[in-house]
Curated annotation (Swiss-Prot):
EC id: 2.4.99.17
Metabolic or biological pathway, per its Swiss-Prot or TrEMBL entry: tRNA modification; tRNA-queuosine biosynthesis
Name the UniProt record assigns to this protein: S-adenosylmethionine:tRNA ribosyltransferase-isomerase
Any one Gene Ontology cellular component term annotated for this protein: cytoplasm
Entry keyword Transferase: yes
UniProt subunit comment: Monomer.
Disulfide-linked positions: none
Similarity comment: Belongs to the QueA family.
Major localization listed first in the record, in broad terms: cytoplasm
Keyword Flavoprotein: no
Cell location: Cytoplasm
Length: 366
């Protein structure tokens, strides 16, 4: 399909720079293409749209401080400021990352992280800061590099935590710097498995009170893990969806969770994914007959209109970028024209977009 079919105009004022407070007071646009229904609600109304025996599927990944600032070290060349956003762990000492500016980096370069951009040319340098060094082992397309760190395992994790920053989405980072409030705001309350570069943002709306209301309504809660990579922020540069290449992300669905979700389906309950990351993982783990299997692997699933959904019945998700793979996904779920109408309504009525914005509850188109 032509990528420009998924384009729309989004005013700057619709982009959220901070989340709603409390989290579950965010707006919720309910869209059911099968009944031609579009209604404005709040996230705390979610239980009223679910039935006893339905199951919510959450992504319990935890955002790590994957934004690293440093300097390139090359013999015979001056130190040059660079940054790297880690996006997928390759092994205990290697990470794939997106480097900026990519043209300043080549294979074999050394990078010392722990330097702030502002200290590169200062006389005091980065004295007193923790340091972390790596070799650029491989350079790929779109600024992607493979970093081989000098340390590995938990020691490497601790070093990244020491020198790294939370990698806010570009459309927020362009407006303001990351601050202490983001340390809390950009994590779900149930985040536990470290490894994401971006938050599974639909989950940011949940509160203990909302969990209690869902429990009282007889709604099951299940957790899977997909470590969201920085590729989620990359624009689609091709003119046709067939030419776009997705970046892979590591995910896990346990045998116990797969069994419980299959039992929900067998009883007539619905699988309700909280976020596109949960949906992409469940659809990766499901076979054509809708059976969900355990999963421990990378997925690069790219869902566009025409895709036949295997297991997921409903989706809660925030509002996405024009021409993004995620807007393509929701268009596959509900129909392109339905989602164009929904986004037009959202923009006209002041819904807040993107990671810190409002949310939607989508029913899969029959």
């Amino acid at each position: 399909m032509r990528v420009d079919l998924f384009d729309f105009d989004l005013p700057e004022e619709n982009i959220a720079l901070r989340p709603a407070n409390p989290r579950d007071s965010a707006r919720l646009l309910v869209v059911d293409p099968n009944e031609n229904r579009m209604e404005d609600h709040r996230v705390f109304d979610l239980p009223s749209f679910l039935r006893p025996g339905d199951a919510l599927v959450f992504n319990d990944t935890r955002v790590i401080p994957a934004q690293l600032e440093g300097v390139r070290l090359r013999e015979g060349a001056p130190e040059t400021a660079v940054s790297a956003t880690l996006h997928m762990r390759a092994d205990q000492s290697r990470w794939k990352a997106f480097a900026r500016p990519g043209k300043r980096i080549k294979e074999g370069d050394r990078i010392r992280f722990g330097y702030d951009r502002d200290t590169v040319n200062s006389s005091s340098g980065a004295c007193g800061l923790a340091h972390l060094e790596a070799t650029v082992e491989e350079k790929g397309e779109e600024g992607e590099i493979t970093l081989l760190f000098d340390i590995s395992g938990p020691v490497l994790d601790e070093a990244i935590a020491s020198v790294g920053h939370i990698p806010l989405p570009p459309y927020i980072a362009a407006k303001r710097p990351e601050d202490q409030q983001d340390q809390t705001d950009y994590q779900t309350i149930y985040a536990r498995e470290k490894g994401a570069v971006a938050a599974p943002t639909a989950g940011l709306h949940f509160t203990p009170d909302l969990f209690e209301a869902l429990d009282s309504a007889g709604i099951e809660r299940h957790f899977v893990t997909l470590h969201v990579g920085a590729g989620t922020f990359l624009p689609v540069k091709s003119d046709d969806t067939d030419d776009h290449k997705m970046h892979f992300e590591i995910g896990y669905v346990s045998q116990e969770t797969a069994d419980r979700l299959n039992a929900v389906k067998a009883r007539g309950g619905r699988i309700v994914c909280v976020g596109t990351t949960s949906l992409r993982l469940i659809e990766s783990a499901a076979t054509e007959d809708g059976t969900i299997h355990p999963w421990s692997d990378a997925t690069g699933i790219f869902i566009t209109p025409g895709y036949r959904f295997r297991a997921v019945d409903m989706l809660m998700t925030n509002f996405h970028l024009p021409k993004s793979t995620l807007f393509m996904l929701v268009s596959a779920f509900c129909g392109l024209e339905t989602m164009r109408d929904a986004y037009r309504h959202a923009i006209e009525t002041g819904y807040r977009f993107y990671s810190y914005g409002d949310s939607s509850l989508l029913f899969r188109k029959n």
